[in-house]
Curated annotation (Swiss-Prot):
Disulfide bonds: none
Protein purpose: Hemerythrin is a respiratory protein in blood cells of certain marine worms. The oxygen-binding site in each chain contains two iron atoms.
Family stated for the protein in its record: Belongs to the hemerythrin family.
UniProt binding sites for Fe cation 1: H24, H53, E57, D110
Oligomeric form and interacting partners: Octamer composed of two types of chains: alpha and beta.
UniProt cross-references to InterPro entries, sorted A to Z: Haemerythrin, Haemerythrin_Fe_BS, Hemerythrin, Hemerythrin-like, Hemerythrin-like_sf, Hemerythrin_metal-bd
Organism this protein belongs to: Lingula anatina
Name of this chain's protein: Hemerythrin subunit alpha
Assigned keywords, A-Z: Iron, Metal-binding, Oxygen transport, Transport
Binding site residues for Fe cation 2: E57, H72, H76, H105, D110
Alphabetized SUPFAM superfamilies for the sequence: Hemerythrin-like
Record-linked Pfam families: Hemerythrin
């Protein structure tokens, strides 16, 4: 999936769950803000929205007994581990990796739970 320019959520990333779609928008906004204002505070804010979203999404999956929950949680943990190594100012290649990861994760992994939560 191509990284949208400007980097922003659009309807092609809609999961049909309003709360998840709203949180996905915050992930796009967090990475975009980090690319524009590459500060320690922005990095911490970006990490925080990812942690909160993954917690919320995984909670919804667990509640629905989603069959791919463990696998999906592992993918989230892998991303957070990579993000945990980022230091401000974050290298552009790392921000680009985060953007590419997000635009691929939603349609390949998150879309698997459409209609199942």
């Amino acid at each position: 999936v191509k990284v949208p320019e400007p980097f922003a959520w659009n309807e092609s990333f809609a999961t049909s769950y309003k709360n998840i779609d709203l949180e996905h928008r915050t992930l796009f906004n967090g990475l975009f803000a980090l690319s524009e204002f590459n500060t320690r505070d922005q990095l911490l804010a970006c990490k925080e929205v990812f942690v909160m979203h993954f917690r919320d999404e995984q909670g919804q999956m667990e509640k629905a007994n989603y069959e791919h929950f463990e696998e999906h949680r592992g993918i989230h943990e892998g991303f957070l581990e990579k993000m945990g190594h980022w230091k401000a100012p974050v290298a552009q290649k790392d921000i680009k990796f985060g953007m590419e990861w997000l635009v691929n994760h939603i349609p390949t992994e998150d879309f698997k739970y459409k209609g199942k939560l």
